[in-house]
Amino acid sequence: MDVGCGPGGNAVQLLVPLFPKLEKIFAVDLLPDMIDFAEKHNSHSLIEYSVANIEDRSSIERWENKISKLVALHCFQWLKDQRKGFCNVFNLLKSGGEAAFCFVLQSSLYAAILEIQKNHKWSSLFEGVDDYVANSHHDNYHSSYYEKMLKDIGFEVLYCKEEVKIDSFTSDEEYRDFFPSICALTSHVPAEQKEEFKEDLFQELLKQNGRDSEGLPQHWGNMLELVVRKE
């Protein structure tokens, strides 16, 4: 199962080649638009796409105790109740089934979003708006927190690695365009202020990240990689 499959690229390009003996991939995402896109552009005879929410047991219970392998890439940082998500994964897996997770714990994008929200120019626009900054960033959770949680749920932790990754972008333009596209606040900015918002976010990100030795803008994220087994 691919949890948080998005537009389906990982399922087709990564999971199908990685598991040559698989019988079926159930690829699920919370957003119907993502599933529509995946079915149109990344269809495959071995992949079944469905709208489902890993935090809502009722939407996934038809697969409980049937999944041998589960992958969730860059998905769990969006969850409001990560423990519930992990518990639902536990219920999905067969005995001996394994799950792999990769998600952001803390990042300079989160830090920049929090600073933008405090800026008097923008703060009134974002009152009551969900910024989707991960709880792990707010509460400074690290690998030991998740390792304990997963063991308490009943998983055997096979692999747990926390690592800060720094990525450089090819140009200021790419950097300036990319982050507003994944920032939850952008859609709440009036059209006539979009460019000003993009510039302010760009400057705040530069303040958080700086530039690499070649002068290119960069971004840091503290990533967690986990592999667990249901005993």
Cite the ranges covered by each PLM segment.
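Glycine-rich phosphate-binding loop signature in dinucleotide/nucleotide-binding domains
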Residues: 61-65
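Short, conserved SAM-binding segment of the class I
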Residues: 84-89
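Core SAM-dependent methyltransferase catalytic element
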Residues: 153-154, 177-179, 221-231
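Conserved catalytic/acceptor-binding region of the Class I
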Residues: 83, 96-170, 186
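C-terminal helical/coil "lid" or tail adjacent to the Rossmann-like core of SAM-dependent
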Residues: 157-215
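A short SAM/SAH-binding and catalytic strip from SAM-dependent methyltransferases
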Residues: 67-82
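Class I SAM-dependent methyltransferase SAM/SAH-binding core
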Residues: 1-60
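Helix-to-beta-strand junctions that scaffold the AdoMet/dcAdoMet cofactor pocket
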Residues: 79-80, 93-95
